[in-house]
UniProtKB/Swiss-Prot annotation:
Protein name: Probable serine/threonine-protein kinase PBL15
Principal place of residence: membrane
Source organism (scientific name): Arabidopsis thaliana (Mouse-ear cress)
Function according to Swiss-Prot or TrEMBL: May be involved in plant defense signaling.
Highest taxon, organism lineage: Eukaryota
């Protein structure tokens, strides 16, 4: 049965709004102009035609004058209406104590993320709540294009498993995004940082289902969206460990009509990107499915997608784990030792087989995300714990005399991982 949260869009009620007629964009294949140098839009972008959501090229900061910033704000306000709050920089400085280090949550390719608090004292009608304030570093890896892409996508998409964008700020060279605050941080931190308690099996499965629902929602839109950077650091967790996808800076509209794929410059994160995308630049929703399979393997094993410090045949999680994924008795040799056998044997095996299908070298052999959701939801209630069914602890024979649970647990050595909610 289809989950209603993953099929929210219908042909009679499309989610996308067209840009205002005086606003333009740049796509990887077709040039329509850009927000700082607007030209009349094409005739097909009429009031009754919902064209594909535009993506935007990086603009030099020298081009982002007062007038261009004002035009961007005007265009976004016309397009998104009251869906997002257009914050002023002085307001953001007020709620972060001028971006004080005491309020710093993390740092990554975009810049720094600070915690703040908004309410109706700051702006009338604002819901009182903590927020995450993401401040663009003008010397960083991401820029205006990614900032604008995120505003456009998250400004129009609403789903329980997508992080909520509350507002933005565009003043001269400053680019800021304001999100709902996710108190549990990123999945990356919970899986790979020693200071975090191990996630129980039921919680891992819950996270896997919720993240799959987020991707399924994007893929099942009338005009599908390819997330393009699915990884543990972009999966954020609320107080109940409900997973939400964040960081839409690399998201892209999928193929339309008779086209089987879109061709684009290869971007994303090494270890998660699908091989056909890396080699050809051909991008489909099945590219996201591959990345999802990698994250499933991380949830099962507690290992990162790539670990250069390991022996060569163990550096890539797929190459290392694949020989163990089709047998329950062999699978236990690569299960996260922090679970200590507290996982369902059947659910773990079925999850491993699903992950193996997701990372198939042939994109056509990978399942759709709606099918992934259905498969994982059927595993939630299994109670055959490995620790009580003879599958744990590992015997020396099952280990082949090579790897002990204690040694395998050392992959979380003191090396500090990058903060969660940002692209590494």
């Amino acid at each position: 049965m289809r989950d209603s949260s993953t099929t929210a869009s219908t042909k009679s009620s499309p989610l996308w709004k067209p840009f205002a007629s005086n606003c333009c964009s740049v796509d990887d294949q077709t040039v329509f102009g850009n927000l700082s140098r607007c030209r009349p839009s094409r005739s097909e972008f009429s009031k009754n035609h919902l064209g594909p959501l535009p993506s935007f090229r990086r603009l030099s900061f020298a081009d982002l004058s007062r007038s261009s910033s004002a035009r961007i704000n005007e265009d976004l306000a016309q397009t998104l209406g009251a869906d997002l709050v257009d914050f002023q920089m002085c307001e953001l400085k007020m709620i972060t104590q001028s971006f004080s280090g005491n309020y710093l949550l993390g740092e990554g390719g975009f810049g720094k993320v600070y915690k703040g608090y908004v309410d109706d004292y700051l702006r009338q009608s604002l819901k009182a709540q903590p927020v995450a304030v993401k401040l663009l570093d003008i010397e960083g890896l991401q820029g205006h294009r990614e900032w604008l892409s995120e505003v456009i996508f998250l400004g129009q998409l609403k789903h329980p498993n997508l992080v909520k964008l509350i507002g933005y700020c565009c003043e001269e060279e400053e680019r800021v995004l304001i999100y709902e605050f996710m108190p549990r941080g990123s999945l990356e931190n919970h899986l790979f940082r020693r200071i975090s308690l191990s996630l129980p099996w039921a919680t891992r499965l819950k996270i896997a289902v919720a993240a799959a629902k987020g991707l399924a929602f994007l893929h099942d839109l009338e005009s599908p969206i390819i997330y393009r950077d699915f990884k543990t650091s972009n999966i954020l967790l609320d107080s109940d460990f409900t997973a939400k996808l964040s960081d839409f800076g690399l998201a892209k509209m999928g193929p339309e009509g008779s086209k089987s794929h879109v061709t684009t410059r290869v971007m994303g994160t090494y270890g998660y990107a699908a091989p056909e995308y890396v080699s050809t630049g051909h991008l489909t929703t099945k590219s996201d499915v591959y990345s999802y399979g990698v994250v499933l393997l991380e949830l099962l094993t507690g290992r990162r997608a790539t670990e250069k410090s390991r022996p060569k045949n163990q550096q890539n999680i797929i190459d290392w784990s694949k020989p163990y994924l089709t047998s329950s008795r062999r699978l236990r040799c690569v299960m996260d030792p922090r679970l200590a056998g507290q996982y369902s044997v059947k659910a773990a095996k079925d999850t491993a087989l699903l992950a193996l299908q997701c990372v198939s070298p042939n994109p056509k052999d990978r399942p759709k995300m709606l099918a992934v959701v259905e498969a994982l939801e059927s595993l939630i209630h299994y109670k055959d714990m490995a620790v009580s069914s003879g599958h744990w602890p590992l015997s020396p024979k099952s280990q082949g005399g090579k790897v002990s649970p204690k040694v395998r647990g050392d992959h979380r050595s003191g090396r500090k991982s990058a903060p969660g909610s940002l692209r590494s």
